[in-house]
């Protein structure tokens, strides 16, 4: 992809089991001089397939996405949803340390970092602790033998939506999920085992954090804890939606992204 000399890009990282399509309705009003990048995650295309049994890490994802940033880019705005939020945070750290491209801002819808919640289970609210304990103790969810299987996919999709969602999905959508089931499992393993403590993700750039009113208790806690270590962050609760609000309520989310661009421009 070509970008104009001295150009900024806005790179959006999609969530587990979705794709770049989730960003389409959000990109109608990018700031002047900013080019959108919506790459496909590692393993979601035949060229980058992750075969069953192969471990895929956050570092692998970051390297894959970093390679998508065109030569000549001067600044990067990073966005992400769920697992994509963890990757966006990690990419922001790597780019900042490298010093090659300035990270301008972060816009994240419910970034998922289960690992630091698991590490501090004793300090969690009861409803959060209950969910986290289930994820850590479930005999199937974080075990390679079952990861990405039909039963695993059903459990994953129903957890982030509601019971029966997997069964109600069109067969074409279920078939596509099966094709990337192992990589989906690897992404869940990353958020549960590789995510660092919240204090690791401290920045001094504009940050917007969004969560749905009806999201899960852990997702609520993750957003709050990430905001606590980033006092400059704006944390907004979107009424009437849950974890998948980017897909289910794109106009509502797009309005919040427009607010983010306004805050960035005002600095």
Predicted regions and their residues:
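Conserved HGGG/HGGXW glycine-rich cap/lid loop of the alpha/beta-hydrolase fold
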Residues: 5-54, 68
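Conserved acidic catalytic loop of the alpha/beta-hydrolase fold
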Residues: 59-76
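Short beta-strand immediately N-terminal to the catalytic nucleophile in serine-hydrolase-like folds
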Residues: 78-80, 109
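Gly/Ala-rich beta-loop-alpha elbow adjacent to hydrolase catalytic centers
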Residues: 80, 84, 88
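Flexible "cap/lid" loop of the alpha/beta hydrolase fold
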Residues: 100-143
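Conserved alpha/beta-hydrolase catalytic His-Asp/Glu region
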Residues: 144-185
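Conserved serine/cysteine hydrolase catalytic core
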Residues: 172-228, 234-237
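Catalytic histidine-centered segment of alpha/beta-hydrolase-like enzymes
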Residues: 238-254
């Amino acid at each position: 992809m070509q970008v104009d000399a001295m150009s900024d890009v806005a790179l959006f990282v999609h969530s587990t089991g979705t794709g770049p399509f989730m960003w389409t309705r959000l990109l109608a009003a990018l700031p002047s001089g900013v080019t959108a990048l919506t790459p496909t995650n590692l393993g979601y295309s035949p060229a980058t397939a992750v075969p069953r049994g192969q471990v895929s890490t956050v570092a692998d994802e970051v390297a894959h996405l970093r390679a998508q940033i065109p030569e000549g880019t001067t600044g990067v705005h990073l966005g992400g949803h769920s697992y994509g939020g963890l990757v966006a945070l990690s990419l922001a750290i790597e780019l900042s340390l490298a010093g090659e491209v300035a990270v301008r801002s972060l816009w994240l819808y419910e970034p998922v970092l289960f690992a630091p919640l698991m590490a501090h289970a004793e300090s969690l609210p009861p409803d959060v602790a209950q969910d986290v304990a289930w994820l850590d103790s479930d005999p199937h969810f974080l075990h390679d033998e079952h990861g990405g299987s039909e039963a695993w996919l059903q459990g994953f999709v129903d957890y982030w939506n509601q019971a029966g969602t997997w069964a109600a999905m069109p067969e074409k959508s279920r078939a596509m999920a099966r094709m990337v089931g192992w990589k989906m499992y690897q992404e869940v393993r990353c958020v549960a085992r590789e995510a660092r403590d919240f204090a690791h993700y401290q920045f001094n750039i504009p940050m917007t954090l969004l969560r749905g009113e009806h999201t899960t208790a852990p997702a609520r806690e993750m957003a709050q804890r990430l905001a606590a270590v980033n006092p400059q962050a704006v944390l907004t609760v979107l009424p009437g939606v849950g974890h998948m609000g980017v897909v289910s309520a794109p106009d509502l989310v797009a309005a919040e992204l427009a607010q983010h661009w306004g805050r960035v421009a005002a600095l």
